[in-house]
Each structure stands twice: as structure tokens, then as C-alpha cells.
């Protein structure tokens, strides 16, 4: 991976020397999100493809910490965690088989479990970046308690690469539940809103919830958990 990293640094410095815009790309599953526009090298733009820079750098199941490169497919990371009975605390949407860890953190999309578990940024322990000058910067570490100043690593969640291209991310992971169940309860919209308010004040292991209308004139529907 040292060769891939060297190539990425060279691409950044070449784009900087030529005063060319540099666009960071990954699996391409979140092209709809943010200020996106289609670009190609033929347009005079430089594309920094992060997908070759992939793989799990370190994983300590006993410490509930994993560090992986930005181009690592989310499916690959989640499978590695599942082998040890663990998972990501948040629930990042994949939007396709090419979804990567770097894109997950850069977009900051936490999925339906955000309300109960927390956001992406709450579980970022450390990060390595490639800045606009081709320098590699490191922030945070692999522990929850970081007293080294402002936690720049968590600032990367949702930043969409404006501070630099994510190279590696260290995340806190959590034990995987032994059983997951889905429930569907008949309810009107008013009942659903009342229930949601009550449930939020209790320590219930609800990862996601929604209300769907059934189209009936009486305003009926169902709560799905």
C-alpha cells in the first residue's frame, strides 16, 4: 500500500503545481449527495481515486477498535466485524456494492440507528488525511479519551473531503446483538407521535422506527420498529 499512497501524494502535488481542480472519488455510490457534478480528466480536472487504498490496518476486538483505509468496502469491513460478533454502532447506508469507509465518514450519513446509537462522528477516534499540499496529517488515535486538543478527526465526518482526502479512519465498534426483531403495530399518526415521544425517554433498544399510512380514510397506519 505504500506505493498506492505515494501515487496519491504525487497526484495531489501534480494537481497543485498545475493549478487544476482535484476531485476525490470513491465507490461512487453517493454522487447524488452534496454539491456534486460529473467530472472527467478530459475536462481538465484531476480525479483522486481512493478505492485502491483499501484494507483493514488493525483490528482489536477486545478493545472494540478498528482502523481501516478509506477505500475499504463497507461490506468487507462489516463482514470482518461480524466474524467477531461486533458491528458499527451507526448504520451507514450503502447505496450500492461500491460503498467505502471513506465515503461513509466523508458523507456523515449515520442511517436510521442514529437516534438511538449516535452519529458517525461520535465513533471516530482518529484519522489520517492527505492535504492539498500532498502532506499526510494524523489526528486522534485509537482510544476514546483524547485530550490532545480539538478533535479534528471527528470534524471529518460530513466534511466531504474539504479538509483533505481521508486515508485511514479509526472507529469504535460495539457488540452485535444476538437477536434482532422487527415489529409492526397498528396505530394512527397521532398515536405514533405520542409513542415515539414516550419511547425516546426510555432506555429501549430501538434502532429505528417509522409510521406508515395505510391509505384508509380514518387515517390509520402502522408503526414499524
Model feature map: region roles:
Residues 24-30:
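Glycine-rich beta-strand-to-loop/alpha-helix junction loops that act as flexible
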Residues 28, 93-94, 212:
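Residue-level "edge-of-site" marker
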Residues 106, 125-225:
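C-terminal substrate-binding/cap subdomain adjacent to the FAD-binding core in PCMH-type
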Residues 31-32, 97-98, 215:
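Short secondary-structure capping/turn micro-motifs that flank functional sites
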Residues 33-38, 110, 140-142, 168:
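Short acidic, glycine/serine/threonine-rich loops at helix termini
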Residues 32-54, 80-82:
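Glycine-rich loop at the start of a catalytic domain that most often binds anionic cofactors/ligands
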Residues 1-24, 50-97, 105, 109-142, ...:
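N-terminal glycine-rich flavin-associated loop
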Amino acid at each position: 500500500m505504500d506505493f498506492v499512497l505515494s501515487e496519491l501524494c504525487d497526484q495531489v502535488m501534480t494537481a497543485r503545481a498545475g493549478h487544476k481542480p482535484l476531485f476525490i472519488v470513491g465507490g461512487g455510490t453517493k454522487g447524488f449527495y452534496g454539491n456534486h457534478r460529473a467530472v472527467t480528466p478530459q475536462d481538465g480536472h484531476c480525479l483522486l481515486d481512493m478505492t485502491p487504498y483499501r484494507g483493514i490496518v488493525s483490528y482489536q476486538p477486545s478493545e472494540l477498535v478498528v482502523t481501516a483505509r478509506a477505500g475499504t468496502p463497507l461490506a468487507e469491513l462489516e463482514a470482518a466485524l461480524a466474524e467477531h460478533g461486533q458491528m458499527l454502532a451507526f448504520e451507514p447506508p450503502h447505496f450500492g456494492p461500491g460503498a467505502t469507509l471513506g465515503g461513509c465518514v466523508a458523507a456523515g450519513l449515520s442511517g436510521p440507528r442514529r437516534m438511538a446509537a449516535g452519529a458517525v462522528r461520535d465513533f471516530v477516534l482518529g484519522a489520517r488525511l492527505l492535504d492539498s499540499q500532498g502532506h499526510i496529517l494524523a489526528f486522534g488515535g485509537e482510544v476514546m479519551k483524547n485530550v490532545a486538543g480539538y478533535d479534528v478527526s471527528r470534524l471529518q465526518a460530513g466534511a466531504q473531503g474539504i479538509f483533505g482526502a481521508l486515508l485511514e479512519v479509526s472507529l469504535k465498534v460495539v457488540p452485535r446483538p444476538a437477536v434482532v426483531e422487527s415489529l409492526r403495530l397498528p396505530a394512527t399518526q397521532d398515536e405514533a407521535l405520542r409513542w415515539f415521544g414516550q419511547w425516546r425517554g426510555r432506555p429501549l433498544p430501538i434502532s429505528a422506527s417509522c409510521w406508515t399510512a395505510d391509505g384508509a380514510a380514518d387515517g390509520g397506519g402502522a408503526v414499524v420498529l
